[in-house]
């Protein structure tokens, strides 16, 4: 079993107003074992915070960078950290 981690990703491109946060939540729930949120930022990016097993978070990051996301992703910047907890489920903020 892999260690639990915290993934914080900032997704840029045409990612607001296209259902991106909803689909991100759906993908996180489909992968399972993660908690966190997806949030629209004022500069047009979407911030995704996910905590859970490393392989699940890596799967979510791979999806964020893939061609199956709604809208258009121009790039994803991520940082990895230790989990902080405090999330229940995966929310859209």
Curated annotation (Swiss-Prot):
The reaction(s) this protein catalyses: an acyl phosphate + H2O = a carboxylate + phosphate + H(+)
Claim: Cell cycle is one of the keywords in the record: no
Enzyme class: hydrolase
GO molecular function, one term: acylphosphatase activity
EC number: 3.6.1.7
PROSITE patterns found in the cross-reference section: ACYLPHOSPHATASE_1, ACYLPHOSPHATASE_3
Domain Acylphosphatase-like: 6-93
A matching Pfam family: Acylphosphatase
Entry-linked InterPro entries: Acylphosphatase, Acylphosphatase-like_dom, Acylphosphatase-like_dom_sf, Acylphosphatase_CS
Residue numbers annotated as active site: 21, 40
Keyword Cytoplasm in annotation: no
Keywords of the record: Hydrolase
Similarity field: Belongs to the acylphosphatase family.
Name recorded for this polypeptide: Acylphosphatase
Organism of origin: Streptomyces coelicolor (strain ATCC BAA-471 / A3(2) / M145)
């Amino acid at each position: 079993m892999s260690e639990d981690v915290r993934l914080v990703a900032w997704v840029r491109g045409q990612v607001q107003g296209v259902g991106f946060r909803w689909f991100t939540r759906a993908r996180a729930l489909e992968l399972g074992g993660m908690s966190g949120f997806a949030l629209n930022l004022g500069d047009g990016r979407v911030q995704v915070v996910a905590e859970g097993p490393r392989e699940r978070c890596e799967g979510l990051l791979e999806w964020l960078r893939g061609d199956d996301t709604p809208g258009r992703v121009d790039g994803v910047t991520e940082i990895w950290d230790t989990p902080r907890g405090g999330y229940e489920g995966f929310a859209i903020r």
